[in-house]
Structure formats: C-alpha cells, structure tokens
C-alpha cells in the first residue's frame, strides 16, 4: 500500500468522520462539553486523591478501603440508580450526579477524618453510579443509528483528552499552590487546595447540563425491558457479555487506582512526573477511542475488541518487571 492509496483513504475517512459528527444533536454536543469539563476535573482528582489521603497521615489500608467503598456502592446502587434515572429523566439525573460529585470534593476537604472520607466515598459512589447508568441511555436517546457509534467513541475520546489535560495540570498543581502559599508541595494543605480547585472546575460542568433540553421519558409502555427479564430470557448471552467485562474490570480495579502510589513508592517519582505519565496514557487512550469507529467499520467490532484487549496483556507483564 503506497502513499498514493493511503492519503486518499485517510482523506475519505476524515470526511466521513466529519459528516457523522455534523449529525450530532444539540443535546449530544452539550454533553460532550460536559464530558470535557468533568473529565479534566476528575483527571486531577484521580491523580491527587491518593496523595491527599496519605499526606494526612493515613495509611494505604484506609486508602484501599475507601476505594473499595466507592466501587462497592457503585455496584450495589447501579440497578436502583437505573430505575431512578428512568423515573426522573436523564437531565435531572446528570445534574444530581454532578452536584453530588462537587459536594463530595468539598466534603473531603472540610471533613478530613476517617468517618468523613467514608461518608464522602459513599456519596461519590452513588454519584458515579447514577452518572454511569444515565450516560448510555442519554446518548441512545439523543442520537440516531447512523452517527451513534461515532458519538459514543468521540465522547469517550474527548473525555480521555480532558483527562490528559487534567493529569498534566494535576501534576503541576500542588507545587504551584505550594509556591503561592509557602507550604510543602507534598503536604495536606497543597493537596487540599488542589481538590478545591477540582471542585470549582467540576462546578463549571453544570453549565452545559443546564442547556440540555429534556427528552420524553421511556417507561415500560415504550418497550422497556427489565434487566431481570433479560437475565431470565437470555441467560447465556448475558453471561457471555458480562464475564469478559467482569474479568477486565477486576484486574483494572486491583491495579489502576494504585498506579500513582506505585510510581511514588517504587520509583520516587514527583507529582509532575506521575501526572505526565498518566497524561501520556490518557492521550493514547483518547487516540484509540477516536479512531475506533472507522477501524470497527473496516475490521468489525468484535475483532477490534479482541485484538486491542489481547495487545494490552504483554504491557501489564512488562510493567510489573520494569527496573
């Protein structure tokens, strides 16, 4: 394949991508803006939260329990949150989840005790669960089949680009705040003020949600199918869909929340270095998400998923044995 054939194909793919993006509804565009602002805020949060807890004198055991609490609440609340989102609508659900997330960030700064962290972890889990179960139905209701794959991919890609910016900014933020306040860059004051900055940035994500126009709620009369009904009618299909995601999520849950602690304790990396590493990872994930739709159109969705998942395994082994 020569450049004479590659360039026209790239040009045609770019034109097709732009055509699909032009089909996005106003609500979908507002949600993309929300994804960028929220993704940047929580890119900073995910980088610095572990360091904030440890800087207060707590140990990794408490940190692990806090992260487990968030995940457990997300799991338990997922089904009720789905019903709740169906009942009150997508826009109120997104607004409530965003407000709860902001309240959680502020609460972690003003109530930095073990009880406070557990309470805020429960609230964060509820907020993230409600946001997660609302995301998919909202995107489905505000897109047509022609552009839907591109909307999902671009929203995820833009979210990862926002996390790239948040990771990079998060790496610089504690040292910058420490310079302004005359405190230690790895102390609780610098990390606490950084979380306040995250809360302010997350608050700006409320603006695009306010611009979203409410859609008609799809209830049981509109063909709603209970997840229990799906489990009863197609148990084998549901099992095949859930198991790969369950195994992948289990591995990610054991590894990813502690990557920043791993870099700090194993390699003595600074916040800026860790932020840069996280940012590079987010950037490449964003590129992969954005180019996924044309690749899926060309090679098939299932083949693309299998190949990309398989390629990640050797790199996980290399990470564990890196010098």
Regions found by a protein language model. Give the residues of each.
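Central cavity-lining transmembrane alpha-helices of secondary-active solute carriers
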Residues: 65-82, 279-292
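Hydrophobic core of transmembrane alpha-helices in multi-pass small-molecule transporters
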Residues: 36, 104, 115-131, 246-247
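Helix-loop junctions at membrane interfaces in 12-TM secondary transporters
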Residues: 109-120, 320-323
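C-terminal membrane-cytosol helix-exit motif in multi-pass small-molecule transporters
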Residues: 199-218
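Helix-loop boundary and gating motifs at the non-cytosolic
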Residues: 13-73, 237-278
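Helix-to-loop junctions at the C-terminal end of transmembrane segments
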Residues: 77-89, 174, 288-301
């Amino acid at each position: 394949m020569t450049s004479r054939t590659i360039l026209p194909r790239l040009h045609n793919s770019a034109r097709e991508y732009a055509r699909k993006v032009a089909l996005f509804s106003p609500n979908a565009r507002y949600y993309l803006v929300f994804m960028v602002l929220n993704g940047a805020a929580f890119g900073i949060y995910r980088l610095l939260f572990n360091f904030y807890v440890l800087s207060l004198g707590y140990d990794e055991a408490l940190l692990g329990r806090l992260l487990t609490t968030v995940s457990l609440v997300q799991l338990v609340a997922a089904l009720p949150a789905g019903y709740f989102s169906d009942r009150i609508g997508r826009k109120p659900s997104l607004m409530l989840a965003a407000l709860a997330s902001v309240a959680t960030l502020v609460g972690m700064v003003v109530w930095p005790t073990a009880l406070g962290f557990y309470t805020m972890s429960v609230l964060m889990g509820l907020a993230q669960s409600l946001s997660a179960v609302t995301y998919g139905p909202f995107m489905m209701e505000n897109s047509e089949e022609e552009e839907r794959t591109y909307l999902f991919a671009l929203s995820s890609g833009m979210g990862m680009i926002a996390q790239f910016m948040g990771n990079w900014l998060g790496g610089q933020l504690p040292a910058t705040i420490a310079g302004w306040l005359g405190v230690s860059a790895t102390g609780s004051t610098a990390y606490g003020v950084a979380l306040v900055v995250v809360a302010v940035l997350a608050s700006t994500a409320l603006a695009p949600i306010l611009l979203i126009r409410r859609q008609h709620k799809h209830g049981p009369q509109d063909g709603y199918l209970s997840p229990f009904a799906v489990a009863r009618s197609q148990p084998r299909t549901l099992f095949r869909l859930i198991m790969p995601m369950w195994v992948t999520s289990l591995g990610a849950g054991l590894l990813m929340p502690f990557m920043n602690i791993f870099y700090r304790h194993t390699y003595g990396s600074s916040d800026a270095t860790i932020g840069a590493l996280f940012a590079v990872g987010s950037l490449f994930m964003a590129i992969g998400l954005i180019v996924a739709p044309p690749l899926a159109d060309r090679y098939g969705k299932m083949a693309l998923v299998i190949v990309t998942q398989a390629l990640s395994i050797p790199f996980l082994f290399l990470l564990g044995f890196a010098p």
